[in-house]
Each structure stands twice: as C-alpha cells, then as structure tokens.
Amino acid sequence: MLHNIDLNKMNQLMKENKDAKQIISQLLENHHTAVSTIAHEIRNPLTLVSSALQVMEIQHPEVKDFSHWSQMHEDVDFMCSLLNELSSFNNSDSLHYSVFSIGQLLKNIAVSFAISLDEHDNHIEFSSDIAPDLHNFTGDKIKLEEVLLNILKNAQEAIPTDTLHGSIHMKAEQITDMLIIKITDNGCGISADHLESIFEPFTTYKQNGTGLGLSLSKRIIEAHGGTISVNSVPGKETLFTLRLPM
C-alpha cells in the first residue's frame, strides 16, 4: 500500500521529469489494478462463506449454540468491511466532480447523524452550527459525505457508554475562499503517540477497526486540495479540522 509521503515524492518527481511521469503513472495504474483484482478475488469466496453460514443457521438452528459461531460471523463481517474500505482507499483519489450546496449537504448529514444517535446512543448530545452563507462547492459529494460521516462515527465511538453527558459538535464556516469544518467530541481522546500515526493506512487503536477510515478520509480531502488535522487532549476532547478550498 502506498503511503501519503510516497505519493508526495512521486508527484514531485513527475513534475520534474517527463519520463519519470510516464513510468510512475503506469506503476500507479498497475498498483490500482492489482489491489482491485485482489479485493475482487477475495470477495467472491468470502461471499460464499457468508451465504453458507446463513444456510447452515436456517437448516440447523442448533449451530447457534456453538461457542465460536458468533465469532465466525464477526470475522466474516470484519473481512467484508476491510475489503470495502480497501476498495474505497484504492479509489479515494478518483473524484467525480459536481457543483452542489455544501451547506445543504452538511445539514442533511447533521440530521441523519442526529437520528442515528437518538436510536442507539441517547447519552450523546449532538449539535451543529452551519453558516447560512456558504457558497456552492465543486467536488465529489459522495466522498465528502463519507469523510464527514466517518469522523462523526469515530467521535461517537470515542464516547464511553457510561458517560452521562457525551457531546459532539460540528461547525462549518467560510473564511474568504476556504471552507473550514470542525468536529469536536468530549470522548476518551487520543494520546500524543497515537496522533503521530493516526492517518497512516492500517493504523487503528480500537477493537475491530480496519485502520483505513482516517487514512481514506485524508486522501479524499487532499484530492480536493484540502487538509485535515487533529488535536486531542486525552480524557477531555478531540478536534478534527477540515480545510477545503472553495
């Protein structure tokens, strides 16, 4: 898997040398093709395994009493999630541009996320402050929504279930030609050691995490010409800041 620092070096080399640009472009194309092929080849038998488990449950309900049955389901679900995120990561810098109301998108995300909290985590209060004068945005609407929902979901998971007053806040404003989105939570926080590598692929500090969510988010934001950063005080709060050129 190519890391962000590798991509930065390659982009610089491609600008300086036309021959290198052609060679690197071909290597990147082969890299994307290889990852897609591997994911596809693994997904097919994994789908068969998942289907077989479902059939076994229907025909032999007693298998649910097997001590490791639920773990088998969790392992298959984890592999499916990993393949989905791997495919998304592989295509994260391929954007489908359109012009849309970023303000309306943020409002829709806020409503959807608030509803999901009401259903599952009523100990968490969610609030949003979206500036009413945001300009239209040109970018990949679906992938930006994916980034924001991923960060909001991480914030949700960072707040322990025994917290009496969990809080998540999303703020969006436009300063000159820059869109700034901040997402804050009062969850467990992230240690300084973990902050250094949190955007690296396959880096995760939570159970059943794939380690691709934040790395994928970073690649999508950077593909839009923006930046994403994080600040955290362990045991107090975490702040993710997204900056996107309008």
Enumerate the language-model features and the residues they cover.
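Conserved HAMP-HisKA connector
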Residues: 15-39, 50
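Conserved DHp (HisKA) dimerization/phosphotransfer helix of two-component histidine kinases, i.e.
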Residues: 66-116
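Conserved catalytic submotifs in the C-terminal HATPase_c
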Residues: 109, 123-135
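Short beta-strand/loop element within the Bergerat-fold HATPase_c
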Residues: 165-177
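Short conserved segment of the HATPase_c
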Residues: 190-201
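Short alpha-helical Gxxx[C/S/T] motif in the catalytic ATP-binding
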Residues: 213, 217
